[in-house]
Swiss-Prot record:
It comes from Corynebacterium glutamicum (strain ATCC 13032 / DSM 20300 / JCM 1318 / BCRC 11384 / CCUG 27702 / LMG 3730 / NBRC 12168 / NCIMB 10025 / NRRL B-2784 / 534). This is Ribosomal RNA small subunit methyltransferase A. GO terms for cellular component: cytosol. The keyword Phosphoprotein does not apply. Belongs to the class I-like SAM-binding methyltransferase superfamily. rRNA adenine N(6)-methyltransferase family. RsmA subfamily. The lineage of its organism: Bacteria, Bacillati, Actinomycetota, Actinomycetes, Mycobacteriales.
Length: 293
């Protein structure tokens, strides 16, 4: 039966049939778990809050479960797929399940960590994806870095990764991913996804993470990241250490680290987990001012 909006979403029977046709066995190496529940797919698209003007990039479309639903809500969808078999089959699936919407689909056959602006016919305004679990955080951060046009994100990741990304300063699970993701705007949990909507069913549950890119007091460019990222990395490398000790290598000595921290109005005896992204950006700014003198 055709979906009211013009696409027939994939259920368990269609997913298994496609996998058998392509001789595809989901692999841990590529972090593959295929969603076979249409209601879950609809829920993800609804949580993304897309508009008809949005150009979506989807990383790891797999057999096309989410892709079919995305084209209904957006102006276009660019699917980034590393597996040649899956990439080649996706247009066929659209001719079968959503022929009237096939013109909205573009495919980039590439590792998502190597995708560049030049790969895209249209620069994306939204990232919506069931991210490959083994590289979810690096892919998320790369896409935010490479495509400043992305202003909204809704991704599905492992539940514990979702918790880390959305963690607040001071939390035991607050860390490098939390700070770097919040560099672009507020990061929130947008729901949980059970194991049984996937094939094969993973051992752990999944979570939805939402990011809304905001205009920040700092530039979200490579130059700023190159100053801020190393400080974040150093602060959490030995998270039990005080910032004075943790950043001594970065600044050349404990004394230099303490001076920079005090100049940024940060207590040197605090640990890295107590600072938010604004603190880290401010600290990087102190170093920049020092370099400019």
């Amino acid at each position: 039966m055709e979906e009211p909006s013009g696409a027939q979403l994939l259920g368990p029977v269609e997913i298994r049939a496609l996998a058998e046709k392509l001789d595809v066995t989901p692999t841990k190496k590529l972090g593959q778990n295929f969603v076979h529940d249409p209601n879950t797919v609809r829920r993800i698209v609804a949580a993304a809050e897309l508009t008809p003007d949005d150009h979506v990039v989807e990383v790891g479309p797999g057999l096309g479960s989410l892709t079919l639903a995305l084209v209904e809500s957006a102006a276009s969808v660019t699917a980034v797929e590393i597996d040649p078999r899956l990439a080649a089959e996706l247009p066929e699936t659209f001719q079968w399940r959503a022929p009237a919407l096939a013109h909205k689909l573009s495919i980039v056959l590439k590792d998502a960590l190597k995708v560049q602006q030049s790969d895209m016919a249209v620069q994306p305004t939204a990232l919506v994806a069931n991210l490959p679990y083994n590289v979810s955080v690096p892919v998320l951060l790369h896409m935010m870095e490479e495509f400043p046009t992305i202003n909204k994100v809704l991704v599905m990741v492992q539940a514990e990764v979702a918790d880390r990304l959305a963690a607040d300063p001071g939390s035991k699970i607050y860390g490098v991913p939390s700070v770097k993701a919040s560099f672009y705007g507020p990061v929130t949990r947008a729901g949980s996804i059970g194991k049984n909507v996937f094939w094969p069913a993973p051992k752990i549950e999944s979570g939805l993470v939402k990011i809304v890119r905001e205009d920040t007091a700092w530039k979200q460019d490579d130059e700023t990241r190159k100053k801020v990222w190393p400080i974040i990395d150093a602060a959490f490398l030995q998270r039990r250490k005080t910032l004075r000790a943790a950043l001594s290598g970065h600044y050349g000595s404990g004394q230099a680290a303490e001076e920079a921290l005090r100049a940024a109005d940060i207590d040197p005896t605090l640990r890295g987990e107590k600072l938010d992204v604004t603190d880290y950006v401010r600290l990087a700014g102190v170093l920049q001012q020092k370099d400019e003198k």
